[in-house]
Amino acid sequence: MGRIAGVTAGQTRDRLLRAAADAFAERGYDGTRVADIAAAAGVSNGAIYAHFDSKGDLLTGALRTHGRRLLADLFAADPDRSITDLLLTIGRWLPRRRDASGYLIVEALVAARRDEDVAGPMRDYIGERAGWLAGLMTVAQADGEVDPALSANALAHFCLLLAMGSALVTPDLHAVGDDEWTALLNRVIAAVAPTRHHAEAGVMPQTEMT
């Protein structure tokens, strides 16, 4: 059983990524066999290796395609909305994270510690996400929403830690009230806002000064 009749190579790849995302989220990286993914996608094992170099490559491919990207989706839907408002919206959602994509990132992070086939692609994936977030922070700094004296890279790293942590510390392990969490987020946003001194001095974002 190779490629399904009437299905393009791109469609076959999409089917494999969907099947892989579901399998890894449900059974974990170690508990999922390539044969399981192939069977779920309705193709042969050979069809997988026509598109992906390894099981680890398939995991990171599934994460890129089906991993949660709510911030990017919100930004694309409303690019004129303030970035700090977008961050607050995502931040309020984090403690309630219970979707399959959350399990997918956990599996990828755990597998990356044990399997170099996963570690390399995951470094690339995290680097891409960090770069995108840092770019967003630079825009927020230029728009006067975030203190330009702060490192955009450090701000991006902070956001990544919150997002990854929310996938690990689920509400069934530790819950927090919506009101108290929102109050904390508002305090954090206020803390990274431009100081009066920097606003008056017109300090440039760090990423633009280097």
Residue ranges and their predicted role:
Residues G61, A72-G102, A152-C159, T182:
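Hydrophobic alpha-helical connector segments
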Residues A100, P121-E128, W132-G135:
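Short, solvent-exposed amphipathic helices
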Residues A119-R123, G127, Q141-V192, R196-T210:
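Hydrophobic/aromatic-rich alpha-helical bundle segments in the mid-to-C-terminal region
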